[in-house]
Amino acid sequence: MCYNKFMNIRTITTANQIHLENETVLVLGYFDGLHLGHQELFKKARQIADEKGLKVALLTFPESPKLAFVRYQPELLLHLQSPEDRFQKLNELGVDELFLIDFTTDFASKTAKEFVDQFVKALRARVLIAGFDYSFGSDKKTASDLSAYFDGQVGVISPVLDQGEKISSTRIRQAVLEGRVKEAARLLGHPLSSRGIVVHGDARGRTIGYPTANLAPIDRTYLPSDGVYVVDVDFKGQTYRGMAS
């Protein structure tokens, strides 16, 4: 599935900043990595939107909602994708309107009813799409509770399995950290990637006939454990096969 229209991206702090002309199929969730399980939600949303003449909207967060609830740990700021890769993938998956809001303590304090009355209505949702494990509101309602607060159609997407096990961002993060990058890519449905700036090193590679490029990461993305990996390097519009360690 590849959707080539331009996606509108807006950063908001309140529901009052949302202004839409068209009714929507609204997708709800955080979606770190946009893995194969996540992609099923957007495929369903795009299908319904095309059938009903609606737009696909997504309300999500730039950072993990866990930051508002648990003791701070540096890894909570890491992602499976850079923001740019995330936005590009969302565009490919058919999202028309992307709304980003920080998951602050004020946002977290809203009840399920307040969330629906303020944000879902402002986003002009006729259909809601969420994953089976979605939760919302300070009163900790689940995806199965959405229909109690929303009069329109609700679609709850079942888990997607790989080798009998649920595909999840947690599973993929663990695979990356343990160096199982082929497994991570399979579960993501797209290659694991990271960006960096070439910096000067000790030039040891030149002494053995293999000049190297030292990369300083510029994104807060998960990197695999120490090892030697086959990589594709995108540089100035060209792709080169390489090795990274």
Feature-to-residue mapping (PLM):
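Positively charged, low-complexity intrinsically disordered leader regions
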Residues: Y3-V25
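N-terminal catalytic cores of NTP/NDP-binding nucleotidyl/phosphoryl-transfer enzymes
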Residues: Q17-S82
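Residue-level signal for inorganic ion chemistry
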Residues: H35, L90, L128, A184, ...
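A conserved beta-strand->alpha-helix junction
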Residues: T60-P62, L93, L98-D106, S158
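Glycine-rich, highly charged phosphate/nucleotide-binding loops
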Residues: L77-R86, A108-F115
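A glycine-rich helix N-cap at a beta->alpha junction
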Residues: L80-F99
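Classical nucleotidyltransferase
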Residues: D106-P211, D226
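Phosphate/ribose-recognition catalytic cores of enzymes acting on nucleotide-derived substrates
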Residues: G201-S245
